[in-house]
């Protein structure tokens, strides 16, 4: 389950704090985060199969990150790569609102996804699986393979840990510690019996 935790306009010195794990499709070859030769403004990892990315930033203050929406029944084998949605925003010059209109036009062609994207002025979450778009107010958010702030145990623990880690900045150690959380959520039956 991929996880993106972020604090938007919640710290006086850091307008955006992100802690994220990409922990699915391990067999898919990737390149580590670096500035791209064909898009030198973009700092991101790279999907070596389809050429896109799952998370990146630019020197101009643009940010985008993607999670897959888990719904195997809706998967289309011929759908375009969702990683293209991230790089299209990062390498583009359109405003977040203009990009939102572009997303709405192409969203149905893709398998389920959630996309966080924005610049230093605004941050948006877009899902093609139910909630559409949402402008994010200042706060701490968690996104996994369902909708923004779905109260899954890993998301809830991560948001709480990120909120606490904000108080330790500029010390980054608590951010890395929260990403090492390997707790396993109890099955619904186990939780009901407890």
Where are these regions (language model features)?
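N-terminal nucleophile
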Residues: 1-194
């Amino acid at each position: 389950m991929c996880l993106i935790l972020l604090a938007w306009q919640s710290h006086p010195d850091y307008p955006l704090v992100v802690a994220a794990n990409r922990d699915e499709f391990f067999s898919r070859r990737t390149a580590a985060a670096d500035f791209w030769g064909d898009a030198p403004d973009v700092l991101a990892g790279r999907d070596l199969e389809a050429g896109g990315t799952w998370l990146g930033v630019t020197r101009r203050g643009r940010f985008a990150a993607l999670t897959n929406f888990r719904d195997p029944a809706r998967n289309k084998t011929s759908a375009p790569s969702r990683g293209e949605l991230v790089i299209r925003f990062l390498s583009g010059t359109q405003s977040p609102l203009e990009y939102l209109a572009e997303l709405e036009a192409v969203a149905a062609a893709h398998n389920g996804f959630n996309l966080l994207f924005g610049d230093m002025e605004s941050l948006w979450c877009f899902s093609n699986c139910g909630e559409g778009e949402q402008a994010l107010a200042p706060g701490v958010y968690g996104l996994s393979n369902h909708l923004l702030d779905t109260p899954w145990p890993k998301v809830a623990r991560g948001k709480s840990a990120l909120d606490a880690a904000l108080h330790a900045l500029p010390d980054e150690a608590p951010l890395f510690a929260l990403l090492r959380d390997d707790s396993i959520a109890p099955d619904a039956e186990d939780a009901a019996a407890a």
